[in-house]
Amino acid sequence: MPGAMRQSTSNLELLTIYEVSKILGSSLDLQQTLREVLRALAYQLQMHRGRVYLVGEDNVLRLVAANGLSNEAAAQIEFRDGEGITGRILKTGMPAVVPNLAEEPLFLNRTGGREDLDEQVASLVGVPIKAAGVVVGVLTIDRISDEGPQGHFGSDVRFLTMVANLIGQTVRLHRTVAEERRFMMRETFRMQKELRPVAAPINDVVCTSPNMLEVMAQVHRVAPFKSTVLIRGESGTGKELIARAIHNMSPRKDAPFIRVNCAALPESLLESELFGHEKGAFTGAQKDHKGRFELASGGTLFLDEIGDISPNFQAKLLRVLQEQEFERVGGSKTIKTDVRLICATNLNLEEAVGHGKFRADLYFRINVVTIHLPPLRERRQDIGPLARHFVAKFAKDNGMALVMEDEALEVLNRCTWPGNVRELENCIERAATQSRDGIIRTESLSCSLNLCNSSVLFQYRTLGASVGGLAPSMGPGAINRVPPGRPGGPAAANAPKTPAMPAPVPEPAGAAAARGRPARRVVPRPLAGLRRRPAGGSGPPDPACPCPSRAPLPPQAPPPSPAAAPPPAAEVPLDEPESGSLRDRLLWAMERTGWVQAKAARLLGMTTRQVSYALRKYNIEIKRF
């Protein structure tokens, strides 16, 4: 080669290297960058049909950029280690030159495009692409000649090796950035997952107490999966709200959320509602009806109060849960379904299984992930935020300004709330309707209106009785426990014979003797809503008075003389001391009313200020719950 021509070629190669370096640093799109490099090689140095292959994570060499091929066609081309000329370059890590591709048996021609050469001769030059001494790909180009194969390709090999080194550094940089980005995304996801329990409340779930925050953390953990969830808790704790939160945070959030209250439907109707029925299956079935399992396919089915379904229907439900298929009532066609099941109950299922009222196999089928919702009395930190939430909700729904005094909130904090959050919401709504100037004060609350029997209901339930649909305590002690007043229950023999009254809450055995007082007659105090007799204790109930009056206690009878016969015991509410110091009576009243001074004052016929003064005088510490 003449010296002038060699100098011209060297200058052109230097200019091309400069252009390639600019291209490699101009874009973050690796494929687009490599295609621009191949175009520059073809334009500047007539290096045609440039190809860049990169090794994937599976060690397969894939075509990522090709001059003259579409992205779709290039994506289909790959080579194994040692396969063809390109695979051999990958395996050996050494350049390869093929002077005449038409005479090379190892040439596979997978990329095509050389059929129109006629009398021209195509030569191939390929070099490995290395990064940090490791082969990460292959760069190949074609040389087209009209005069037969060229005899010397040394300058092309040296030049392409420099280009391949630049490409290798760029590939390494892109892969490092991509790996760091994936790592940062994983770390971000992990940190978000850990911080979710203290994130913003889910929908209307208002909570700040540690035990409810743990429930929320459990909701976040279980939501992404299809596992069956059993939500347990007393009535009014918000089981449906938690079920909706699980659905809304799951991959099924855009699919239906179907709720069925199993306790509200008889067995025959429940089967039709869940499985559907065919036309003519029974009287009144005038058309085909899709069941809830069919409607909820792809979404979530929430079975509320599942502990109340009959043992007969439990067997039918078990088959659907096991096989995810069912038949409509009156039909024979098997229907497949794909539902995420969430169940809820306020009953002690373990006790029901032990008594044969709930199938053990169904219990184990639904008891996969269990979420226990604490009662409101065990999450008192939430009473204030919940009360303010319900006040704001009532104000918004009714288009008014409404606030609550701190003193009223303090009264709410001392209540036992056997009806839990639902009872609190009702209490706020009732108090809001009684407020005249948009301020909920203490006198607006049910306690001041003598309409609250929370403490009485709480004592009934904790002793094992079922009052007004409120389930007994679900703790281990609830199993095989006999409620008071029933045969075998505590103090059953001494229970007073008072018809048309709720069963009294008995005093624990030995409690009277421990206080140094003789036992006395006990008369239950009527619950709110029961009609009371007029003053004097005789005559029919007064239908116009639905709640107990705020009457003072009966006067204390003077002590009888030793010779006189003892007078009949005075009828006092529950086990109020008939005699003794004011301190004893004050302690009794505070214990009976959950340490709410306003209630204790009404029970003793005193004012709230008198009760507060007496508590300070006798140095009685107020219990906080």
Swiss-Prot record:
SUPFAM superfamilies membership: GAF domain-like, P-loop containing nucleoside triphosphate hydrolases
Region span, Disordered: 478-578
Residue ranges constituting the Sigma-54 factor interaction domain according to the UniProt record: 205-433
Positions of ATP binding: 233-240, 296-305
Subunit structure as annotated in this protein's UniProt entry: Interacts with sigma-54.
Biased composition (Low complexity): 489-498
Taxonomy, superkingdom: Bacteria
Annotated stretches, region: C-terminal DNA-binding domain: 583-625
Biased amino acid composition, Pro residues: 540-570
Region (Inter-domain linker): 434-582
Task performed by this protein: Required for activation of most nif operons, which are directly involved in nitrogen fixation.
Protein name: Nif-specific regulatory protein
An example molecular function term from Gene Ontology annotations: ATP binding
